[in-house]
C-alpha cells in the first residue's frame, strides 16, 4: 500500500480484516500501477451512520447513503471506500470495476455490483453475512464487542 493516509486509515478496520484489505489494495496498486486512497470514515458508529442517513432527508445537505445506522458494513469496520489518487488529487471517476477480480480473490464484495444502488467506491467483507447485516447488528446490540467497539466474532 503506497498512500500514507490509507496506511493510517486501514487501522480503523476490524482487526480480523486489516491484512485482507491491505493485501487487496497492495495487489491492485501493483497490478494497475495506481495509488489508492481509503476515504473517510472507515469505521462509523451507528450514530454517525444515522447522521449520514439523515443528510438530505431530515437535515441539510445531499443524500450520501441509503444505509441507516446498523445496516452498513462500515458500522462494523468491515468496509472501505476507495478512490484513485491521480494528478495530485482524488479521482472519483476511476473505474473501480477493474479491481473486482482482485477483490473477489480476497472475498470482498463490490458496491458497484449491487442492484438497488451502485456504490462504486465501496468494498466490503461479508464473510457469509447477508447484504443487510442484521446478524452483526444483533451481536453488537447484545454486547458482543471488544473494548474498541469491534465485534468479537465476524
Residue ranges and their predicted role:
Residues 44-48, 57-58, 88:
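Short, charged/polar surface micro-motifs in flexible loops or helix N-caps
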Residues 1-41:
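Active-site acidic/histidine clusters and adjacent loop/turn architecture
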Residues 33-34, 57, 107-112:
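Short aromatic/hydrophobic-glycine micro-motifs
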Residues 56-68:
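Cytochrome P450 catalytic domain signature, combining two hallmark sequence patches
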Residues 38-52:
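Acidic helix-start/capping segments at beta-turn-to-alpha-helix junctions
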Residues 67-154:
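Catalytic cores and adjacent binding grooves of peptidoglycan-active enzymes
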Residues 17-24, 48, 95, 99:
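Stable alpha-helical elements in mature extracytoplasmic
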